[in-house]
Each structure stands twice: as structure tokens, then as C-alpha cells.
Curated annotation (Swiss-Prot):
InterPro entries from the UniProt entry: Asp/Orn_carbamoyltranf_P-bd, Asp/Orn_carbamoylTrfase, Asp/Orn_carbamoylTrfase_sf, Asp_carbamoyltransf_Asp/Orn-bd, Orn/put_carbamltrans, PtcA
Organism taxonomic ancestry: Bacteria, Bacillati, Bacillota, Bacilli, Lactobacillales
GO biological processes: arginine biosynthetic process via ornithine; citrulline biosynthetic process; putrescine biosynthetic process from arginine via N-carbamoylputrescine
Role: Catalyzes the phosphorolysis of N-carbamoylputrescine to form carbamoyl phosphate and putrescine. Is involved in the degradation pathway of the polyamine agmatine.
Catalytic reaction equation(s): carbamoyl phosphate + putrescine = N-carbamoylputrescine + phosphate + H(+)
Provenance organism: Streptococcus mutans serotype c (strain ATCC 700610 / UA159)
Predominant place of localization: cytoplasm
Name of the protein in its database record: Putrescine carbamoyltransferase
Induction: Up-regulated by agmatine. Expressed under the control of carbohydrate catabolite repression.
Binding site for putrescine: 270-273
Residues with site note (Important for structural integrity): 29, 145
Record-level GO cellular component terms: cytoplasm
Pfam families referenced in this protein's UniProt entry, alphabetically: OTCace, OTCace_N
Length: 339
């Protein structure tokens, strides 16, 4: 049996593997745009575990499975307790026998790590308090589709504005792995921390990428992509609106002046959902430089590719499999024959 592949963090994948995954995703997207839905996931079943509610992640996974011939099962918050009444080991063992692949959106990163460790089928991290790796893939697809004329990916500069959310760290991981320049422009106390920097240092040593963490707004100049997220962490006590505005507004709000400072050709990105009037203005979000809705569509694009990539036949074929299959088929047909 070949070893299964999990998708828990892009740190486990090489630049070449990630680019191959994106290329696969974009090729499937082109097929579907032209009316052909390749049945690449026919008879495959995805179990989706959600400890947090979701819009884009849930819809993208369900649609991806349906479009490619498979089926997705939604296990809502409260319907399944990872490590609660039933142990993670038991849950993963049972679901490994019922499904072909699992996706889990969890509160604690260790939960999805443990799920993957115990499952005999591939496991995808749909988001945790550590990272958001499926968002990374969608972002990479989007940046490749919107590359500035005459530039390669590694020539591009990406600036993240605001709070050091999971999305901020995930964007830092994928861009530096691609050899790009990443800047986190955010207030002190809400910047990428020493743990994040240690991981980015190791990636940059191998990739040639570079990163900067600063509260100096001059760092946004020359950006090819300007990215922001909401001004509060998902898994800590949320700041009140008044506290958020005192810390981040107006310096870290992406408005037309900030976009102009970044550069005339800079594109705007946001993982969504957005809090209009806080981290982003309507003028920018709905403006000609915004690609955030292309980015949202590419969640589906990249998830289709990811599912196909992970569900390659990792179970090595036994030479007797075909014989057993034919025998089982014959026995079933005999049983179903009318008397």
C-alpha cells in the first residue's frame, strides 16, 4: 500500500508540488468553464467535520465533490465531538472505513493533526487556529491568474495589512515558499510573532524569498498585491468594535489612498468575509483593482485540484484485485437475477 498524503500545512509540500497542484486546479477549471465536468471523483465520498461555521469552505468542498462526480457529507458543529464522547482515534478509524477522504475545520490545530495521524485516508485541514492552507492554494491560483505583465511569481511583492490572523501567516508561508517578497504591515502587538518568523526564516533560506514585519506604511510601496483580513482573531476573545478602531483605524484601513501608495497596478485581495467600513472601504472592494471575488471563486478551483491530487490511487493495486472484483460482480448479478 502506498503512503497516503495529508494536507495539513503547506510546510509539508515543496514549491514544485504546490505549483503542480495549482496547475492541475487551473486545468480542471478550464475544462469546467468550457462545459466539461471530468468525473475524476466518481464514487468518492468526502466527510466534512466542522467545529466552526463556514460559508466558502463548506460550499467549495461540496460543490467540488459534486462537479467531479463525488459526494460530500456535512458534519455540523455539535454533531461530532472530536476527542469528546468518542476519541479522535475512534472517530478517525470509523470515518476511514466510511469515506475516501476527510476535511476538518477545527478550533485547535492539534485536533486535525491527531485526526490525520489516526486516519488511514487523506485528511485536509479546512482551517485551524494555526493556519488556513486551503485559502493559501486559492490565493496562489489567484495571484498566478493576475500576474503583472512581464513579471514572474518570484518577482512579485505581496503586502498584508492589519492583524496577524491565520490567513496572514498562511499567506506568508505560501509567498515566501514561492520565492516572493512578503510584507506584514501591522501595529506592534498584532504582528507576526517569533514562532512565525522562525518558520519563515527556514523557508526563505531554501527558497530565496524574503519577508518584512513593520508598522512603517512606506513598506507598502511597490506592492503587486495588497491583502487584508478582519481586525480580530477568530480563536481569542474578540475585540470590541471600539477597541478595533482605536488600534487599527485609520492607519490600517485599505482605502484608495493606500492603494495609490502601493502602486497604480496593485491588485486588492481579501479572504472574506469582509467588514466593510473597517479594514476595507467599499470604493476599493468594489473597485477595478479588486480581485477578491475571483479569489473567492478560486477557493473552489483549488479545492477541486486538491481533492483530485490527494485521491490519486494511493492504494497500490494488488494483482488479484481484478479477479476478486469480477468474482464479486458475478455473485451479485447472480443474486439479483429474477427467479
Amino acid at each position: 500500500m502506498m503512503k497516503k498524503t495529508d494536507y495539513i500545512t503547506t510546510e509539508d509540500f515543496s514549491k514544485e508540488e504546490l505549483l503542480k497542484l495549482v496547475d492541475l486546479s487551473l486545468k480542471i477549471k478550464a475544462c469546467i468553464k468550457n462545459g466539461y465536468y471530468p468525473p475524476l471523483l466518481e464514487h468518492k465520498s468526502l466527510g466534512m467535520i466542522f467545529q466552526q461555521t463556514s460559508t466558502r469552505t463548506r460550499v467549495s468542498f461540496e460543490t467540488a465533490m459534486s462537479q467531479l462526480g463525488g459526494h460530500a457529507q456535512y458534519l455540523a458543529p455539535g454533531q461530532i465531538q472530536l476527542g469528546g464522547h468518542e476519541t479522535i482515534e475512534d472517530t478517525s478509524t470509523v470515518l476511514s472505513r466510511l469515506d475516501d477522504i476527510l476535511m476538518a475545520r477545527v478550533e485547535r490545530h492539534q485536533s486535525v493533526v491527531d485526526l490525520a495521524r489516526c486516519a488511514s485516508i487523506p485528511v485536509i485541514n479546512g482551517m485551524s487556529d494555526y493556519n488556513h492552507p486551503t485559502q493559501e492554494l486559492g490565493d496562489l491560483c489567484t495571484m498566478i491568474e493576475h500576474l503583472p505583465a512581464g513579471k514572474k511569481l518570484e518577482d512579485c511583492k505581496v503586502v498584508f495589512v492589519g492583524d496577524a490572523t491565520q490567513v496572514c501567516f498562511s499567506l506568508a508561508l505560501i509567498t515566501t515558499k514561492m520565492g516572493m517578497e512578503f510584507v506584514h504591515f501591522g501595529p506592534k502587538g498584532f504582528q507576526l510573532n517569533d514562532m512565525h518568523k522562525e518558520k519563515l526564516d527556514k523557508i526563505c533560506e531554501r527558497s530565496g524569498g524574503k519577508y518584512t514585519v513593520t508598522d512603517n506604511e512606506d513598506a507598502i510601496e511597490g506592492a503587486d498585491f495588497l491583502y487584508t483580513d478582519v481586525w480580530y482573531g477568530l480563536y481569542e476573545a474578540e475585540l470590541s468594535e471600539e477597541e478595533r478602531m482605536q488600534i487599527f483605524f485609520p492607519k490600517y484601513q485599505v482605502d484608495s489612498q493606500m492603494m495609490a501608495k502601493a502602486g497604480a497596478d496593485c491588485k486588492f485581495m481579501h479572504c472574506l468575509p469582509a467588514t466593510r467600513g473597517e479594514e476595507i472601504t467599499d470604493e476599493v472592494m468594489d473597485g477595478p483593482h479588486s480581485i477578491c471575488f475571483d479569489e473567492a471563486e478560486n477557493r473552489l478551483t483549488s479545492i477541486r485540484g486538491l481533492l483530485v491530487y490527494l485521491l490519486r490511487d494511493y492504494r497500490e493495486k494488488n494483482p488479484y484485485d481484478l479477479v476478486k472484483q469480477e468474482k464479486a460482480k458475478e455473485e451479485l448479478e447472480t443474486f439479483l437475477k429474477p427467479e
